[in-house]
A protein has these predicted regions:
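Catalytic core of non-heme Fe(II) oxygenases with the double-stranded beta-helix
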Residues: 75-146, 150-162
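Non-heme Fe(II)/2-oxoglutarate
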Residues: 1-74
Length: 162
C-alpha cells in the first residue's frame, strides 16, 4: 500500500499574524541537536522538548482541534506540541510518528529560503508558508531538507487517538 495516498489536510489559519506575534514573543527552552544532550530526535535544529501549552500554542491547538472535528469526526484525541527553529543548514531526518494517529506541522515563520515538508515515498513537497497547517496520518514518512535561511519556525506535534 502506498501510504502517501492517505488523506493529507492543508489549511490556513485566518488570524495567523496575531498568533505568530504571540508565539514569537513567548519564551521557550530550546536545545540544539538533542542527541548531544542524550535526547534522541530527528530534528537537527533548535527545538523544545515535551508538550508545550503556552498561550500561543494553545491557540494553535484549539484551531487544530476544530479542524479535526470537521474533517476526522468520531474519535477522541489528545494534541501534543513542540517548536522547532531552523537556521541555515538545519534539517530533519526522515521519520514517521507511529504509534500516534496523526501528526501536524504549523508554519509560524517562513523567511525566503524556508525548506518544505517532503513526504518521502511520493516525493511530494509542501511549501512552507506562514499560517499553513498540514495534518497527516502519522505513518507517512517525511523529512525537511537543509534549510537555506535563518529563522524558519514551526510548531509540530502528534495527535493521539483515544
Amino acid at each position: 500500500m502506498v501510504r502517501e495516498n492517505l488523506k493529507v489536510l492543508v489549511e490556513y489559519h485566518p488570524f495567523h499574524e496575531s498568533i505568530k506575534k504571540k508565539i514569537l514573543e513567548e519564551e521557550y527552552n530550546f536545545l540544539y541537536n538533542p542527541l548531544i544532550d542524550g535526547y534522541n530526535s530527528n530534528i537537527r535544529a533548535y527545538r523544545t522538548l515535551g508538550d508545550l501549552n503556552t498561550k500561543g500554542i494553545k491557540l494553535v491547538k484549539e484551531w487544530i482541534s476544530t479542524l479535526i472535528r470537521q474533517h476526522y469526526p468520531g474519535f477522541d484525541y489528545n494534541i501534543g506540541a513542540w517548536i522547532a527553529k531552523y537556521n541555515k543548514g538545519d534539517y530533519t531526518l526522515e521519520h514517521d510518528h507511529i504509534p500516534s494517529g496523526f501528526s501536524y506541522v504549523y508554519f509560524v515563520k517562513t523567511p525566503k529560503g524556508s525548506s518544505p515538508l517532503v513526504f518521502s515515498t511520493s516525493g511530494k513537497r509542501i511549501k512552507a508558508e506562514e499560517g499553513k497547517v498540514i495534518i497527516f496520518p502519522a505513518c507517512m514518512r517525511h523529512h525537511v531538507p537543509k534549510n537555506r535561511c535563518e529563522g524558519r519556525v514551526t510548531i509540530a506535534g502528534n495527535i493521539w487517538i483515544s
